[in-house]
Structures are given as C-alpha cells and as structure tokens.
Design a protein with these regions (language model features):
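Hydrophobic alpha-helical connector segments
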Residues: 60, 74-103, 156-160, 182-185
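Hydrophobic/aromatic-rich alpha-helical bundle segments in the mid-to-C-terminal region
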Residues: 105-110, 121, 143-191, 199-202
Length: 202
C-alpha cells in the first residue's frame, strides 16, 4: 500500500523545483504563489498546505538545498582515509556539487532576501550547528595528532574552504566571462591543504 508520505514527497519536491525556477527568474519578492502554481501545476491549495506561504516555500527550498550541500561535504570527509584526502576531497566535492546543482547553488549562495532569511533563521542556525559539530568531529583527531594545524575550527574552515567558495560565487555570477570551474579543482584542493596541513601531515 502506498502511504500518504510516499505520495506527498514527490509533490513537495516538484513544487520546490518549480519555485526555484520562479525565484531565480523573478526573485522571491517578485514571485507570487500563482506563479509557482502555474510553473508546478500544483494547486494553490496544495502549495499552502505544504508550505503555508510563499516565504515558507522559499525557506524550505533554502533549507533543503543547504542540507543537501552539507550532506555532500560531510560524506567527502567521512569517506577519506587521510587528513589530506579529507581536505582535498571536500574541496572537490564542493565544486562538483556547485556544477551539478548550478541552479540550487545560485539560490543558496546569492539568495539574501530578508523574507527567506527571517523565515528560516532558527532552522538555518540549527542546521549549521549540526554541520559544524560533525565537521569538527572529523577535524579534531587530525589536529590532535598534528596532521592539521591547531587553529580555531572556524578559522581552519575559512582557510580550507574560503577560496573555493569565493571561486564558486564568481562562477555562478558569470555572464560573458565563461570559464570551467572544474579546471581549478586541483589548484584549489592543493591550496586548501597547504593552508592547513600540520607538521605531522600525511
């Protein structure tokens, strides 16, 4: 027997996918529930049932995207067999995710509209806290054994991921300047490792 949740999950995702198209085209403020209805084919009632409001759709899309990004990043860390592999693998995973999910990445990195941030602020804070807790759990043993420099976790993350995040932003914002972001994977991965590797690095 097909459960209601099995039926509703694809509907929710279809609405979110349609909303993403609308938001990237018109912005959250410039998008209406009716526009999402037309793009998705879902009834206005269904949209309100699942998300409560347009801002609710925008917030859920932001959280869903952030969750997927964090999961991809953490998976790269957990599957690594060394400190070097974890640092470099997570940089590569970040760039791969941005290319594979370009539309969602644009929304995640460039959506700063007040309605979205305000609606989802507590949930975003919880999600980020969980992410940093898990990333730091991977990081701590490598720091303890001298494989990664002893820095504050957030400073370490900034040195490690800052350049590749900024490069992704430049790629997502490109217009006439066409370039392949993946051409920089090796250079960015090496730079990340060089910036945080400790004396006992391997």
């Amino acid at each position: 027997m097909v459960s209601a949740s099995n039926v509703e999950a694809p509907r929710r995702q279809a609405i979110l996918a349609a909303a993403l198209t609308c938001f990237l085209r018109s912005g959250v403020t410039g998008t209406t529930i009716d526009a999402i209805h037309r793009e998705s084919g879902a009834s206005v009632g269904s949209i309100y049932h699942f998300f409560g409001s347009k801002e609710g759709v925008a917030a859920e899309l932001y959280l869903d995207t952030l969750r997927d990004y964090f999961d991809t990043y953490l998976a790269a860390l957990r599957s690594s067999r060394s400190s070097r592999a974890g640092i470099q693998g997570s940089v590569r995973a970040h760039l791969d995710w941005v290319v594979t999910h370009e539309a969602r990445a644009k929304y995640l990195f460039h959506c700063q509209e007040f309605e979205v941030i305000e609606e989802s602020l507590p949930a975003i804070a919880r999600l980020r806290e969980q992410f940093y807790h898990q990333a730091n759990a991977w990081l701590a043993p490598h720091v303890e054994h001298g494989r990664i420099k002893s820095l504050s976790p957030r400073l370490c993350q900034a040195l490690w991921m800052g350049p590749s995040i900024e490069y992704a932003r430049l790629w997502l914002a490109r217009s006439g300047d066409r370039f392949n972001i993946l051409d920089a994977q090796t250079a960015l991965a090496r730079a990340a490792w060089d910036s945080v590797k400790g004396r006992a690095a391997r």
